[in-house]
Amino acid sequence: MPALGCCVDAAVSPPPGYSFLWDSSLPAPEIFPSGVPLSTNTAATTTTTTHWSPAHSSALYSIDGWGAPYFTVNSSGDISVKPHGTETLPHQEIDLLKVVKKASDPKNSGGLGLQFPLVVRFPDILKNRLESLQSAFDYAVQSQGYEAHYQGVYPVKCNQDRFVVEDIVKFGSGFRFGLEAGSKPELLLAMSCLCKGSREGLLVCNGFKDADYISLALVARKLMLNTVIVLEQEEELDLVIDISRKMAVRPLIGLRAKLRTKHSGHFGSTSGEKGKFGLTTTQIVRVVKKLEESGMLDCLQLLHFHIGSQIPSTALLADGVGEAAQIYCELVRLGAGMKYIDCGGGLGIDYDGTKSCDSDCSVGYGLQEYASTVVQAVRFVCDRKNVKHPVICSESGRAIVSHHSVLIFEAVSSTTTRSQELSSVDLQSFVEKLNDDARADYRNLSAAAIRGEYDTCVLYADQLKQRCVEQFKDGNLDIEQLAAVDGICDFVSKAIGASDPVRTYHVNLSIFTSIPDFWAIDQLFPIVPIHKLDERPGVRGILSDLTCDSDGKIDKFIGGESSLPLHELGSNGGGDGGKYYLGMFLGGAYEEALGGLHNLFGGPSVLRVSQSDSPHSFAVTCAVPGPSCADVLRAMQHEPELMFETLKHRAEEFVHNDDEQEEDKGLAFASLASSLAQSFNNMPYLVTNSSCCLTATNNGGYYYCNDENIVGVGAESAAAEEELWPYCVA
């Protein structure tokens, strides 16, 4: 299988005025001679005369670093998806902008009419990730003469989506891939899916357990699923012994060891002696003794451990695996029937493309290095202790699912500091109204601007603004004059070559719903425009979401940046048809599961896209509209149907009391009721194109196709196309 190496074409150099993400400095601002500002069309001239290519955008956003081998920039300036990684042929690449247009175009134009935000899943990438992980371990096992095999386990908590889990079971059945569950619902999900998977695939039961959980796990064992109950707490052992005897089931038991090895990275708190889960060495000895007394020591077959998520280096990995392998060998010495060593999670991904051991957004290794380190560490300890090599497992959920999912959202507007311009007469009038101190600051500011003294200009501009604010508070300046201060300061800033202020781009998204890890733990994800990458970005901006919360913004980006290079928005938004689309990548793990309903913004629409031989190289195999306003209201225990009836009754009263003809009253009522019904059926997000509105669509439905033209499944779905599902106006 292809190696997942990340490289950046060193031959591409940044155009004037830009630096790449890994650069630590930018060119010094140009000082205009005699303080005279450049012509207002200079920026446009620079943009058109300086050649800008997709390769420049790829380097600017470090796409070849974090995106390889699945994402690149094509010759049209769009993000291109390589569903089979390095084995993707040129005609198999998928233009992401074409996928977005297919999803969002109205149905009467051949689109699906889905509303943003939109999650696009690529199951082919999921398959490639599984195969690459298995291939890396297979190579390590073969090259090092390891006398057992590797079989992975997917922790469903990373992304419990039905199709994601089913795809993993299907794609992994040929190499005994299993599932891990940490709760009773996840266990039920895993049991059902593994009925179609490999019989050797493990069903690892982690998390806190009560009698019901353990009974369910033992039922799975009865159903011939290869189920292992992993002891996270010492007291769980008594329940396992008692319930297994009552059910007459011989359990497979694992235990989670609390290692001393700990890493100090972003997720280091999940590891070490003070980690949330696991048994100390003292507890492990007691568990072994109790199992021996119960005649069940042969049931203990698996050792599980977790060094921590996003393990930064192979040195730390080798240290932790070596410690765990010592515990494994000791369990063998004590008589346990050991067969498996489960490395847990920790296989990291490179969010910023730097391959750095010192970054919370990166890791200093690839899949092959990870696999080789694990195999070598286990083999070394077992050979020294003369212990049979165990089957190696890992729960590498983040590494499996992160790449396969892309979040697409629109920038709908931007906030700029367009200050008013003053004529010489207005300027003279403004200056006359300033107090002596403010007037002195203005004169000093003008003089410093003529001399081109940037730092001095900033000082006097700040002082002038502050003094004018104080005058405004005292009632000595009106609001127009206060606004004029910004215009003066902006003019001077341009005259001395100061950089343009960072803009705020308003995006049709809830960060709390779709990117919760950014808000909660400062996790950074690569965010880039998915089109216009053959054009030079003209501004820098931060992203502000739709929520009524000051935390609902993204002002930190990979590469240590506090703003993102962006393109100018047109009069109706971005470039193509007034749209400007951004993509958040590598967010396929955890983000959907952790997202909440802040401001009652629900989840995104979801599109499942497979590579095909069709003209555009892709087929939509599943489309799920995002939750409607009614759906999210219902999730908070409201009753949308009753709410609709209440509002419809109020509308009827309002129309009845109006001084209109009876015929007009009927039309007015029908219009109001229809508008209310539409509001309940629409998604909570902004509808930037009325043709993309999801009225008259069953939001709870799934739609499938085998080609690019989507078709409904069953008469029920087809009938639902033409009705406002629960809110029909009689």
From Swiss-Prot:
It catalyses: L-arginine + H(+) = agmatine + CO2. The active site is at C548. It comes from the Eukaryota. GO terms for cellular component: chloroplast. One of its GO terms (biological process) is arginine catabolic process. Disruption phenotype: Reduced alkaloids and nicotin levels associated with a lower putrescine production. Occasionally, an early senescence and a lower viability of the older leaves is observed. Residues 1-37 form a transit peptide. The modification N6-(pyridoxal phosphate)lysine is found at K157. Involved in the biosynthesis of pyridine alkaloid natural products, leading mainly to the production of anabasine, anatabine, nicotine and nornicotine, effective deterrents against herbivores with antiparasitic and pesticide properties (neurotoxins); nornicotine serves as the precursor in the synthesis of the carcinogen compound N'-nitrosonornicotine (NNN). Required for the biosynthesis of putrescine. Catalyzes the first step of polyamine (PA) biosynthesis to produce putrescine from arginine. Belongs to the Orn/Lys/Arg decarboxylase class-II family. SpeA subfamily. NCBIfam families: PRK05354.1, speA. This is Arginine decarboxylase 1B, chloroplastic. It comes from Nicotiana tabacum.
